[in-house]
A protein has these predicted regions:
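Conserved hydrophobic alpha-helix
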Residues: 69, 125-132
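Catalytic-loop of the protein kinase fold
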Residues: 134-144, 149
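Activation-loop N-terminal segment of eukaryotic-like protein kinases
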Residues: 149-162
Length: 242
């Protein structure tokens, strides 16, 4: 076995830093770079061959979405290596960054709703999501927990720079041109904002306004807005029914 293969086939020196329903995330040094490893679980309830095939397809879709997002001008972690047999993606660890959810929790409250701060967040998220959707990239889990703010201090707030907003966790991402999928992606964001950041109820409307400004195909954007209203209505009906 070659030296790089030995390194690639174990987690020695990597620290488990997160675990979700689909994967474990490790942090360590790979080829001299601070690196994250995302390792997808085996699903024991599925047939082994089916599980292997579905997991490989999911990893390929995730990597494809990350690469396309970067090509669209959206900041994402760089992919270093992919090991389909080990169900792993080795990717860049983003330094000097804070999760957007934590940033909002720290900086914004009901008493101190800073328009400059909210406009900065709306400008960043609205622009980034418009870039993704304009290239038919559906994130699938667009929440403030899946956005990092990089190199942010008080001097940066109010000065939107594309690379300040880094989109992470493309585990549910796919490529799809339908207005329905884009509308649902937006609705997921709206629901997450209302749940996690009820102190800023107008944030989504600000994001949606910027999104419409930056979506490249204006005629399709009108269709997305219309479809979003339908999706929103369906969601409200489900909430009422329970």
């Amino acid at each position: 076995m070659l030296p790089y293969e030995k390194m690639f086939n174990n987690m020695n020196g990597f620290e488990l830093i997160a675990q979700g329903a689909e994967a474990r995330v490790y942090k360590g040094i790979y080829l001299g770079k601070l690196t994250l490893i995302k390792e997808r679980f085996e699903k024991k309830y599925r047939h082994a061959d089916l599980d292997k095939r579905l997991t490989k397809d999911r990893i390929k879709a995730e990597c494809r979405a990350i690469i396309r997002a970067k090509a669209a001008g959206v900041a994402t972690p760089a992919i270093y290596l992919v090991n389909l047999e080990r169900r792993c993606i080795y990717m860049e660890y983003i330094q000097d960054a804070i999760i957007l959810k934590d940033f909002i929790d720290e900086k914004v409250s009901k008493e101190t709703n800073d328009d400059r701060l909210l406009n900065f967040i709306a400008q960043g998220l609205g622009t980034v999501i418009a870039k993704l959707h304009s290239k038919n990239i559906i994130h699938g889990d667009m929440t403030t927990s899946n956005v990092l703010l990089k190199n942010i201090d008080d001097d940066h707030i109010g000065k939107y720079v594309a690379n300040n907003f880094v989109i992470i966790d493309f585990g549910l991402a796919h490529i799809e041109s339908s207005v329905e999928d884009k509308a649902v992606d937006l609705y997921v964001l709206e629901r997450s904002l209302l749940s996690a950041h009820s102190e800023v109820p107008l944030l989504f409307s600000k994001i949606f306004e910027i999104y419409q400004e930056h979506y490249t195909n204006k005629s399709q954007c009108k269709e997305i807005v219309s479809k979003y209203k339908e999706v929103q209505l369906r969601g409200r009906k489900r909430l009422m029914i329970g």
